[in-house]
Swiss-Prot record:
It comes from Geobacter metallireducens (strain ATCC 53774 / DSM 7210 / GS-15). The keyword Transmembrane does not apply. This is UDP-N-acetylmuramate--L-alanine ligase. It comes from the Bacteria. Cell wall formation. Pathway: Cell wall biogenesis; peptidoglycan biosynthesis. Keywords: ATP-binding, Cell cycle, Cell division, Cell shape, Cell wall biogenesis/degradation, Cytoplasm, Ligase, Nucleotide-binding, Peptidoglycan synthesis. GO terms for cellular component: cytoplasm.
Amino acid sequence: MYGKIEKIHFVGIGGIGMSGIAEVLLNLGYKVSGSDLKQSDTTDRLASLGGDIRFGHARENLADVDVVVTSTAVHDDNPEVMEAKRRMIPVIPRAEMLAELMRMKYGIAIAGTHGKTTTTSMVATALTHGGIDPTIVIGGKLNTLGTNAKLGQGQFLVAEADESDGSFLKLSPTIAVVTNIDADHLDFYTGGIEQIKDTFVDFINKIPFYGLAVLCLEDRNIAEILPRVKKRFVTYGLSSQADIRATHIRLEGGTTSFVAHYKGYRMGEVSFAMPGAHNVLNALACIAVAMELDVPFAQIQEGFAKFGGVGRRFQVKGEVNGITVVDDYGHHPAEIRATLAAGKSGWPDRRLVVAFQPHRFSRTKELFAEFVTCFYDADVLVLTDIYSAGEAPIEGVTAERLAENIRKHGQRDVTYIADREALPDHLLQIVRPGDIVLTLGAGNIWQTGEALLRKLETAEG
């Protein structure tokens, strides 16, 4: 960035996407301030790194700053945004600041409706073990780092590319990964899946002539846009037509392994501690990126062997009296199906008890029919009220109605508990040794699993 930019203020700094950028900027020597509605481990970490963190949004939070960065959850009526505009301080979206960081390095951007965080984390781990030492900005906490960001000394920056509002088009990566393309964020993409596909084509074609696109051939929508891709690309998947493919897949407990091939050549076995066939595809994308950067396959294997997973991605929170509590961020029907399938394939003999909190009224409305039929791998399903994420309620769109329709479509054991805070006591009454309890959703449902663990420990003691 131009040398006169020294002080940067983040509105909503505690968000997972904002905090990573703020941490990298702090490590680069910029003065960073920010505000958020509440204190968290994330805000505490940023404060310990030298960030000036305020709680609540107020015009007084905007001290002597050169630029204001906002998340997608922050609107024009925010008092800090209004004050910045009054003082003619530039107000930019998070993606634009990420684009500035990416201009300092060769960017590797991981895009797609699902799997971005896990794939980004895998790429970051593989490149680190390959000696590349990338700068990392992830939408989840990488367990081996204990954070979602790191300033590396190498030439590359690995980051998620958020398609939710089209702002990933501000990025200009050298390597672009697209894991899949699905219908989501339909409040923004009013043209539906065709508009979403068009936007991804634009994103892919932004890479330079010497860059590379890494594209999942298993995804129907990606396969459909391949003729429109104008830049060099490789494909990955399970099909023999994919450039990089997996065979001999094994899913055992929390471990996944497979044999990786490149254009017919057998490279070797990869194993990592994260369940689910969908994570095989994420791992193949990682291998494609690492191979493009000439990381030896042995070091790629080592990176996977030491991959510690990602916070809120099938994260085992604890086990008490034979009851395992797992948390996952999945909130789209496709993600839910994949996550439940991972649980069933890894532990076929264990009962899967799912506590689901729908995320956003708009998503629940647009994808209602898909939500109704995506829970069949759950032996027991409990729904709680929709996490609004700042949205106004939509008439007729409720978790209770969703639960009723899930039951009508053949799900046998479905319960609706309106108050999320009542869930731990309800779960305590129904769980038994051998169960896997999965809290599922992008809101605050993770607190339910932690509360249940405390109650189980008390009951055991």
